[in-house]
Amino acid sequence: MSTHAILTIVLYVGVLLLLAYPLGGFIDAVMSGQSITSKKPFRFIENFIYKVCGIDPAIEMSWLSYAIGLIAFNILGVLFVFGLQLFQGILPLNPQGLVSVSPDSSFNTAISFATNTNWQAYVGEGTMSYLTQMLGLTTQNFLSAASGIVVVIALIRGFARNSIKTIGNLWVDLTRITLYVLVPISVVYAIFLVGQGSIQNFDAYKDVKTVEVAKFDAPKLDADGQPLKDEKGAVLTGPASTDQQTLPMGPVASQEAIKMLGTNGGGFFNANSAHPYENPTPLSNFIQILSIFLIPAALCFTFGRMVRDKRQGWVVLVTMILIFLTVTFAAVHFESQANPVLTNLGVDGAMGNMEGKETRFGIDDSSIFASITTLASCGAVNSMHDSFMPMGGFVPLWNMMLGEVVFGGVGTGLYGMLVFAILAVFIAGLMIGRTPEYLGKKIESYEMKMVAIAILVTPILALVGTAIAVMSVDGVAGIANPGAHGFSEILYAFTSAANNNGSAFAGLSANTPFYNSMLAIAMWFGRFGVIVPVLALAGAFAAKKKIAVNEGTMPTHGPLFIVLLAGTVILVGALNYVPALALGPIVEQLMLPVIH
């Protein structure tokens, strides 16, 4: 472990806490209708939106109405983005003349951005027009982030309220979190990125002359422009060279800001945050990883304020930080090791495993970024996870298997962790013979059924999807690396989709009707198959009477509960995947020293 890695992580946690604490208080004030929302200019904008949309902000919803409204809202978003891709060829802001996207890819992308997954089976700069990127994908980045935040706010209200059958107004919650939190921060963030070197324009792509002539092997073509092949079917190649390069342009900074802040992760370019137009400098790289955890950390403080016990928020946050530190140090350690396969070929391994990494970021910043982006449901990358060492790739895969509850996505991480907190209290109650209670609310059979559904949905989707893929011809056809790593690529894809992360072991050819359809199904049910039971929990807790603290109440604000909560997350959340992990990265690591 290098000094640079340790100092970076320490600085990161320190700055994160300094920024998250006031933001958490601000979110509490915004969602309760205080602070900035009471100022006349902002109140006018908010009320104008309600009037145009026909919303009565005074009417609250039951959990079922809240859930139906949220699902319907996201279905409309899916249909809009799907249609935008199908007709982008005839729409404006398309200087490259990019054609319409195929129906299966459009379906996958529309689901992906609506569920905050941002899985991308396409090449952004070669597929999506500026209009599609801005009006479709960037808009969904805001709305999907807001959708996650309002769900956790509703759950917190459930804990805070006493014998009330409503959990808030969905449309008011969506409006306020977008108008007062996501948009203002994103505007400032985008300006910062432009200052660092990110681009923001509507220019056509630029052809430039390179400093050096690039030499490479190019396929030989026949008169019809088709590649020539030898008698064995291999493509014939010949030497070629060029001094020309095409530089893609576009409104990058505005999409990049909400991509990171909203833990969306979908890049404007195929290389994502490894591309210098998205992530130009070490400072922009630090701010990007900081922004991934900013709102998830702030919501822990919001939680403590809303339930009138700040200690509860600190317990959840400390649990998240401890798990984050453990897996991040592990990621840096594994990637700092030389690849024995390359070492046997005489390659100097002193720098560690630099394959798939930007030299400007190196081992430390690439590994830290990988750990953060997979703990959160972000999925943005500044290096290629598929090129990590077997155990280095194990870490981001395992991070997602925890259920995206260690900080996790905006909103989704905290409500996922609170689900595990309920389970931890229930398990502790069984062990010591106490009636399980959490935050003054009794936990009964209905609540535990909802907890079980919320926890089991994602592993079922990930493992069943992986099993179907490895047993089907279409699934196996996408594997470029047969063996343990090929299995890991499929497992990673379905784990990423089901947990709404969106990162990939990109060696898998996933832009096919099979994977576009299967992964879209995993993304949709991985999102709303958890949201619905969480909202059901919110409604159930809101309707319950608060129970006064007594001698039989288990304390949930001390070090013991931190250990219990972390143990529950690790044992229950990740053990479902142990057999699959044994077939993938673990066996690949064991085989590594004997590969020649």
Curated annotation (Swiss-Prot):
The chain crosses the membrane at residues 6-26, 67-87, 136-156, 177-197, 283-303, 314-334, 413-433, 450-470, 518-538, 560-580. InterPro entries: KdpA. GO terms for molecular function: P-type potassium transmembrane transporter activity; potassium ion binding. The keyword Glycoprotein does not apply. The keyword Ion transport applies. Part of the high-affinity ATP-driven potassium transport (or Kdp) system, which catalyzes the hydrolysis of ATP coupled with the electrogenic transport of potassium into the cytoplasm. This subunit binds the periplasmic potassium ions and delivers the ions to the membrane domain of KdpB through an intramembrane tunnel. It is found in: Cell inner membrane. Belongs to the KdpA family. This is Potassium-transporting ATPase potassium-binding subunit. It holds the Pfam family KdpA. PANTHER family: POTASSIUM-TRANSPORTING ATPASE A CHAIN, POTASSIUM-TRANSPORTING ATPASE POTASSIUM-BINDING SUBUNIT. It is a multi-pass membrane protein. GO terms for cellular component: plasma membrane. The system is composed of three essential subunits: KdpA, KdpB and KdpC. It comes from the Bacteria. Keywords: Cell inner membrane, Cell membrane, Ion transport, Membrane, Potassium, Potassium transport, Transmembrane, Transmembrane helix, Transport. Its main location: membrane. The gene is kdpA. NCBIfam families: kdpA.
